[in-house]
Amino acid sequence: MTDLNLPSIFVPXVGLVFPAIAMASXFLHVQKNKIV
């Protein structure tokens, strides 16, 4: 295992997954407020 390949794969994955989770949680929060 090389230390150069891990960041090149791990960083973009976190850069895509973290904003997706943040947007999903915010979207669900807005939906709950609209329903109530």
Curated annotation (Swiss-Prot):
Q: Which GO terms describe its biological process?
A: photosynthesis
Task: Please list which residues make up the signal peptide.
Answer: none
What superkingdom does the record give? Eukaryota
Compartments where found: Plastid, Chloroplast thylakoid membrane
Tagged with keyword Phosphoprotein: no
Its transmembrane ranges are 6-28
List keywords of the entry alphabetically: Chloroplast, Membrane, Photosynthesis, Photosystem I, Plastid, Thylakoid, Transmembrane, Transmembrane helix
Query: Its topology with respect to the membrane?
Result: Single-pass membrane protein
Give an example GO cellular component term for this record.
photosystem I
What does this protein do, in the record's words?
May help in the organization of the PsaL subunit.
Regarding protein family, the annotation reads: Belongs to the PsaI family.
Q: What is this protein called?
A: Photosystem I reaction center subunit VIII
In which organism is this protein found? Answer: Acorus gramineus
The organism that produces this protein has a lineage beginning with: Eukaryota, Viridiplantae, Streptophyta, Embryophyta, Tracheophyta
